[in-house]
Structure formats: C-alpha cells, structure tokens
A protein has these predicted regions:
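Catalytic machinery of carbohydrate-active enzymes
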Residues: 1-218
Length: 218
C-alpha cells in the first residue's frame, strides 16, 4: 500500500494549479494511490479551486500534513520530455502520458462564437511597464496586428470578466467588440466555441491548452 498523495501548488493562480491537474488521475490509474489537496492551499479565487480540483473525481478531499506532490524544491531539477505536463508526471514517478492539462468540466459549445477570436491580454503575474518580467508593449501591439492581418476574416472580441479574478494588468488593443465572461466555466464554454485566443503566457493560455482536448482547432 503506497502512501496517499498530498498535492498542492505553491502559488494560487489558475496556471499554477492546472499544471498539476493530470496527476491525481494518473496516481490512481498507475499506482492505485488516492490524492488529497494539502490543507491550507490558497487559491486566487474560489473558481480556480472549483474548476481544477472541485470537479476532479480523483481528488478525495483535503488532508493535513506536508505535501508530497506539486512544485516541491526537490523537483526543480526536472527531467525533460519537451512537454511541461509530461515533465511533471515524470518527476512524480509516473509514466508521462498527458501533453495537456485536464479539466473535468464538459464545456458547452456556443455556435455564435464560431469564426471569432477571443482576446485576453490580461495577466495577474505579468506586468507591462517594460520592466523585466513582462512584455514589450510595442511588440505586443505589433504581434496583435500581425495576427489580425493573418486572420482578417475572423472577428476579434475582447474578453471582459464579470467577477473579480485578482489584480489584473490589462493591455488594451482595438478589437471588434466585447465578450463578457460570467464565470470560469463560461470561459471554458467560450474557449470551446471560438476559433482562437490571443493571450499572454498566463492562466488563460494554460486553460486554453486544457480546452484543446475538446476543441482541437483552438
């Protein structure tokens, strides 16, 4: 009988948690181990917990103790497979089988978003004052215009979140309109329905890669 897995992400963001989303199922299937979230896990907002762990049937509950899975210091010298989700599976002693993070919510399809690109140039951890950890805004603007030219037939909609998701650094570009997002689940639905998303290397990008399981053309 192998010990239970006590999993936790050091940071509470969406991408921070999604990067471990394939582990509980694989621990169960490959090693017959139950996975619990470490007591005291913090989440930037409750919806991150709801989507990533609350709906994950392989999470058995919350457990006190020290975590033995997640972004632990001993896992920094990672083996490389060329894919970061597989890397996490590998360092946790699992056969690496997943290339994308996983959500267990079945997203809806909105026909009226066909032919549309979502634009979410917001990020919580990346700041855009051309300082160190961030993006050169002129470069962002240029890249966005290139994408618009390349997909001239598509309609581009700026994503606006109804609920508080955290202190957001947002870079505004000209789009054709707005798509209001009422919840993280509604965001999954929209990503499942759109032709593409323009975003930074942020939680939205990680979520989009999970939704590619349902919408491979995203």
């Amino acid at each position: 009988q192998m010990n239970d897995v006590i999993l936790g992400a050091y940071h509470g963001g969406l991408g921070d948690n999604l990067q471990f989303s394939t582990l509980p199922e694989e621990f169960y299937k490959q090693q017959g181990r139950e996975t619990y979230l470490v007591d005291g896990s913090n989440f930037r907002n409750k919806e991150i917990y709801d989507l990533v762990w609350g709906m994950n049937p392989y999470i058995k509950g919350i457990k006190e103790g020290s975590r033995n899975a997640g972004d632990l210091p001993e896992y920094t010298d990672k083996k490389r497979t060329g894919n970061w989700i597989k890397d996490w599976e590998l360092v946790h002693g699992l056969e690496p089988v997943n290339e994308r993070p996983k959500v267990y919510y079945e997203p809806k399809k909105f026909d009226d978003l066909a032919g549309h690109f979502l634009v979410d140039l917001s990020s919580i951890t990346i700041n855009h004052h051309n300082t160190g950890y961030g993006y050169d805004l002129k470069e962002v603007e240029r890249t966005f215009q290139n994408i618009r030219t390349r997909f001239a037939k598509n309609i581009f909609l700026s994503v606006e979140f109804d609920n508080y998701v955290g202190e957001i650094n947002k870079f505004n570009v000209n789009t054709d309109g707005v798509s209001k997002v009422s919840s993280i689940f509604n965001y999954c639905d929209q990503l499942n329905s759109a032709d593409g998303i323009v975003c930074f290397y942020s939680g939205s990008m990680v979520l989009a890669t999970a939704i590619q399981r349902f919408n491979p053309n995203l």
